[in-house]
Structure formats: structure tokens, C-alpha cells
Amino acid sequence: MILFRPADGTSLPRTLRRPCVGPAIRQKALLLASLIATGSISAAQVSGQGLQPDQQPSSVRGTVINCVSHAPIARALVHTPDDRFAMLTDGEGHFEFPLPEANPESGTGFVVNGQPHEVRLYERAGHQLWLMAHKPGFLDDPNERSEGSPGSEITIALMPEALIKGRVALSTADSAVGVTVQIFSRQVQEGLPRWLPGTSVRTNSSGEFRFAELAPGSYKLMTHESMDNDPVATVPGGQLFGFPPVYYPGVPDFAAAGTIELAAGQTVEADLSLTRQPYFDVKIPVANGEMNGRMNVSVQGQRGPGYSLGYNPGDQTIEGMLPNGNYVVEAATFGQNSAAGIVNLRVAGAPAEGSTMTLTGNSSISLEVKEEFTETKWDGTGTWSDGKRTFSLHGPRLYLHVGVEAADDLEQPRGGSIRPPTGPSDDALVLENLAPGRYLLRLNSGRGYVASATMGAVDLLHEPFVVGQGTNTPIEIKMRDDASELDGTVTTIATTPPAAGATVSSELSSPRAWVYCVPLPEGPGQFQQLAVSADGKFTSPTMVPGSYRVLAFANRQPNLPYRDAEAMSAYDTKGQVIHLAAGQKATVQVQLISSSE
């Protein structure tokens, strides 16, 4: 975004910064406007370093380019959300919008701020306006950032889409029409890379499929199982056939599936072959299923999604059809007092009935919090209410937020939340409704910091914990408030001289850059993201003691895998390493890491 200065002399964001967006969005945003003026002022009054009205720029112009080839993009639509400004770029990718003349009486016009290339169009009762660029076949580029100055060229970079396309072939040599193909992408959540399910498409009459508007990254493909409904080949009452799910390049296991690495603008061909197999009726009795209860049933072959069964509440059985193989069938109920069960099932050339599944109530785990605070006076307050009763909160229940998430890829949410207080004196923290599985503990505190969290010998700040049937080992948490302090400077920004005759203001500025404090592997510490002010400064008054690698980037890094030691090894020679003791105040200087590094 382009940074601007409002009428009261405070500064606002300066450079064109574009957030990372999903592949389906083909737009580039450039902040141009807005702010509500608090009085009638002239352009000359806005600040001592502002341009005079007769020096105001008369237009905003620029070029839309391909961020890979840097070639101009012709006939790209550039416009504001309200379409007050809108036009197609010419054959050289250029666009230019005429701007209204500065009006000192109404308080509209352009103002140049203290930092280089700053400009803001403001209106007395305006709202934020962004320039967006659209072009079929292009995406937003999350790694690029442009700067512009009044009357100068603004460059908006778009990223060419990547494509995965292919053909599905059937062992019967029939046309694979209507086969569902699904894509999975590797994305970072809470600092951990995970495989997440994406969109699905159906093959056309030629068995072809196509995934468009893909950003650079890692992908996997799979087909959903489908039945052979050919009326000519199907005999009433006879054997039924289907096509089991297949993972690219032709394996039955998600973990063994090949990873497709895509670069910007790249097209990859990925063909899949399906084998027709006999399907057999399967049935699994549920001992304590409810007649009207809802139940989620999942089926795993080797590992991963693909097969499906359903629950028949009338007969209290899990039913469906599967091909030959060994399966793990899991079932879970919803809501309070939820339960789960698991059985193994083998299908070998005939209808199969599994052993009876017994649903067992999910586990609850107590959290024992030990406070080692040096500051005894804390004025935090809060209440809990269910609409009928209201209780005041005390102790860790007031300041400690506790959550869990599945530790493994593609795992469905398995519950796990803090039990509401049962009365005004109930300060106990209990994680309830935890189904069997592996979990990651997530802790955030509004007071002090989490010094340690363990479950037996397991360090929950770095390792997952396992919940089995009847798990009751408590989680022990230690809280402290002797945090460290960190001040720093991004030297690349701090040494950039301002424009001639200009001053720099960091008040209300949007960040010039972002600093990430990444705890070193297996050590104490807590990840932090810090904003860098216009003068290159950043600070954190509440750093958890520990060792960190401090990294600085021009743009936000939402996909930084800070919990993945192997992935973060790429930054072993970048940034600065600091060691913070309890209560220590430290200062650090770092340089920006360019998008090409």
C-alpha cells in the first residue's frame, strides 16, 4: 500500500503492501485514499512539509506487470472498489486516472508526507479506496511490494497463475466422465506446515480435469471413490463394482502420494488411472449408539481420506460398501458427553461384519497451574455467563486461554475445550471432550508468560501429547512474570534518508517492515511478530526468556514455518541470534531479508 498523511499531521502507511490471498482472488490492491478530516483545512496547512496546492499531482498513473517476466500486462482492469476510478491498461500495461484539484475549503486534495514516496488522497467524509488490478490468469503477488510518489509511476505486479491438469483413465477403457478429483495444498498454520483439503472438480466427457488459479506451492491430488453404474454391465442383484480412491501418481496411501511442486506460471500434467474392483456390503454393530444420535464415521485404508460409510440409527449399525482390504473405522458423536469408538475391519471377497464397536466417553484432563509471579497486585477482571447465570472469574481461568488442535495432517477436529465454571467458586481448569488422538497444546496468557507446560515427561511447549481411553494424567503449567525486554532497529530502514525538506513521523504509521522472533529448536521462548515503525525501530516489553533468531522482512510472513525446525534451517545464516535471561533488557540490530533470499 502507499503511505499517506491525514489532515492532522499524523502519518499513515506508506508503501504498496499486498497481503497473501487465496488462489481464487485475482486482484492487487493499492491504498489510495481516505480519512475523515476533523476540520476545514487547506493543503498547505496539513503539515509543514506538505506540497502547495498548485504543486499537487493531477493524476495517478502506473503500470501493471507480470512479476515473473516483468512484462507489461495489457487490458488488465484497474479500478477502485466503488468504481469511481476504472479503466483497462493499454497495450503497454499503462493506466492513468485524473484526480480532482485540491480544494482547501472542502479539505480534499493530496498531501506529501515526510517519508519518500508518500501521498494520500483524503476527503472530509471519505472512506478507504484501493486500486485493484484484475486479469484472468493472474493472481495477487504476496511477495512483492511497490512504492510510489505523487505524479510518479506506480507499479502493480500480478503473478501468473499455475495450473495442474490431467486425465483420468479407467481400467474398463470407458470414458471417466464425472469422476471427482480433489486437490490438497501444503499451508502453514500456527507455524506448522499442514496438508489441507482444497477444491474438488469433476472430469469432463473426455475424463479431463483442471485446477486453475494456483499459487506457487506444494500440492497433492486424489480421486474420490465412485461406483460403476453402467446399466449394461450391472446385473440386478449381482456383484457391484466401483473404483477405489487413488492418490497421484497412482498409490492408495495419502502419505505415499507424490508432491507436485508448482512455481508461478507453471503448468503440470498429472494423469490418474482407476482400477475397477468388486465392492461388498459391510456392517459394524454399535453397542451403545443412540437411536436419534448424530455420528461422524471415518474410514481409513492405509492412511488418509477417500472411503465413506454411514450410521444407521434405526439398526444402530455402521453400514456401506468397501472393496477388498484392511480398514480402520472410527466413529464419534457430537456435543456434550461425546464419545468415540474404533474397530478394525477386513474385507476379503465377501460381505463383512466387523466386531461390535463400543463407544467410550471422551477424556477430560485437569490443568494444574502454578503461579510464580513476583507482582502480587493485578487488577484484571472478567465474568462468564450462559445467559442464565453470571460468575466472576478468578485466577488462571481469568487470564489463561487454553486450546488444543490435532497434531496430524487431515485429522478432523476432535473437541477439547475448557469446561465452563459450575459455580461462582469453580476456578478449576479442565479440558473436556478429548477424543483419542494426538494433540498440540496452545496456551496464551494475559498475565505474565507460560514458563513450562508438561504432561508427565512430555514437554507440551514442543511436543504433542497422546489421549487414549481413560487418560487422566494432569497437565502441569508454570506461570512467571519476569519477562525479558527487547528493543531493536532494522538498519536498512533506519539508514534510508528522508526526502529533501521532509521529516519522519512514526505516529499511527502502518509498519514499514515486520520482525519475527523465532525460538531456537528445543529451547524455551515464545514466537513473536513485531511491527517496525517508520524510523526502523521495534520493541517488545514482554519477551519470554530464551534463545531466538530475529528475522526482519519487508512484508508479513503468514506462512513462516516457525515451529518446523527443518524448514527453518533455511534461515540459519539469516538474522541475528539473541539469548534473553529472565528480566534482561537487550538491544539488537538486523537487516531486511529480501524476497529473493
Set out the residue ranges of the language-model regions.
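Long luminal/extracellular ectodomains of secretory-pathway precursor proteins
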Residues: 2-4, 32, 36-37, 41-597
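N-terminal secretory signal peptides that target proteins for export/translocation
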Residues: 1-26
